[in-house]
Amino acid sequence: MIRELFEKEGFTLDEEQERKFSIYLQELLRWNKVHNLTSIKKPEEIVRRHFIDSVSVVRCFERIGLDLRGKHFADVGSGAGFPGVPLKIYLKDIKLTLIESVSKKCSFLEYLKIKLNEDYRVLCTRAEKVEEKFDVVLARALGEFEEVKEILEKLSIGYVFVYKGSKLKEEWLKDYKLCELSLSFMPKSYILWKKV
């Protein structure tokens, strides 16, 4: 089911990626029963609205010609790992730091790292307290854009990408460029990006 849903959106998974996404899905469903990590409960919807939506930014990377080799990514407000962990599974060779301030979510991310045998780092703190700089900073479902963009830009020495779903305000385009995507389950999806 996972591979087919990805392929429907134009993303190809190898067996290892499919296996890791399957483990991720199982663990998310299991942990979600106790810890309420996501409001989306149906497996197919988790694959679409969390895994595929997270990976969709790859199309933006391709459009702007972003060379990902050796890049250090930061996922700010990672929650249950979105978009960082799906991107790590899909892109494989990126260096990834997940920044999350809620301890139960940090525990899940650390546990998931072991289950997936992935190499990423979890910083269990508020983004404002992080002094480190990253090549690519990502944020998805992180509150009001106007309130978080300064924090995201402070963390970046390269690019900032902000997933906005189907919501778009004209004033956001003063400082940020627009990457418009179309997925079967979300005909209009916007990702704002900026080279810092």
From Swiss-Prot:
One Pfam family named in its UniProt record: GidB
Binding positions (S-adenosyl-L-methionine): 77, 82, 127-128, 140
Enzyme Commission code: 2.1.1.-
Cellular location(s): Cytoplasm
Key words, A-Z: Cytoplasm, Methyltransferase, rRNA processing, S-adenosyl-L-methionine, Transferase
Enzyme class: transferase
Any one GO CC term of the record: cytosol
Domain of life: Bacteria
A molecular function (GO) term: rRNA (guanine-N7-)-methyltransferase activity
Xref: HAMAP family: 16SrRNA_methyltr_G (MF_00074)
Membership in a protein family: Belongs to the methyltransferase superfamily. RNA methyltransferase RsmG family.
Purpose of the protein: Specifically methylates the N7 position of a guanine in 16S rRNA.
NCBIfam families tied to this protein: rsmG_gidB
Record's protein name: Ribosomal RNA small subunit methyltransferase G
Organism name: Aquifex aeolicus (strain VF5)
